[in-house]
Amino acid sequence: MTSVSRFPEPQAVTSPLTEYAVFLVVTIAPGHEAAQTARDVVGEVGDLVRAVGFRSLHGGLTCVVGIGSEAWDRFDAPARPEHLHPFVAIDGFAHDAPSTPGDLLFHIRASRHDLCFELERLILDALGDAVSVVDDTPGFRYFDARDLLGFVDGTENPVGDGLTDAAYVDGDGDFAGGSYVVTQRYTHDLAAWGRLSTEEQERIIGRTKADDVELADEVMPSNSHVVLNTLTDDEGNDLDIVRFNMAFGSYAAGEVGTYFIGYAKDPAITEEMLRNMFVGKPAGNYDRILDFSTATSGCLFFVPSSATLAMLDDLPPLAEATPTPPAEATPPTPDSSLRVGSLRGEYER
């Protein structure tokens, strides 16, 4: 098992689920001055968290900072995380997973919404016109950590050492203790979902609705959400991610949904789960939850350890002549096999 003590101090990736969150995604404006401002602020977010958190010592305020592929290059860091690349859009069997812009992620969590709001305000004030906000979604914990479809979400998150093993990079030199995070915003058609019987809903999810018990193997559909999100390696070991999804909604905007945020030591694990959902395993045997939940965004970020994040603040100033790089070519499609073994009998959601 991996121990956190082997790493530089991680960011607060594995902090417990809170009552409130803000998912803030921004893009950085062209030019070295904007990149310099963004890099400076990213390195100083910890100071802002302490300043706001001191006002409520029991508020549980944290902020995880993620850096996108193009932004990492613009920051002129001396090295690059091994698996960092833009989120690859998925052309699914019946539904698609889009790739959308995002240079920086600020995943803010607290037990009070005012703490989240105040930290977000200070971050955006510091960034100024160096960035544009492309996603600003306030999330909330819905009853006993259920999604708006009525099912408990994140039941099978690993615990203990397994949580550390799943969330943090072990190796990769200076990037040990970091994490890769994928974010997606899903909107739900609750009216259509509500027309299904509870039994139909349970077969789509793979768990009972009232008491959150996994369906027995003999009645578990092969395209249930649980089955398609269960991966093992060639030795039969579980390949897990850590989810901190939250509900969101605005009836004025006419949308309700789930903000998916999944942390992993290797983004290929999350990407394999998403391909299973959208393409199906085998192809065409896709996740029927997508008939009621539409992905409207998709980003991938690297979450450096706290030490690496602080290191960015100590780098030499960006040279004025440094051009804004052209858009990256789409990276090669990750190996769809991931060396993943057969789906096991015990599934997870």
Which sequence ranges carry the predicted segments?
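Long, histidine/aromatic-enriched segments associated with O2/redox biology
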Residues: 1-347
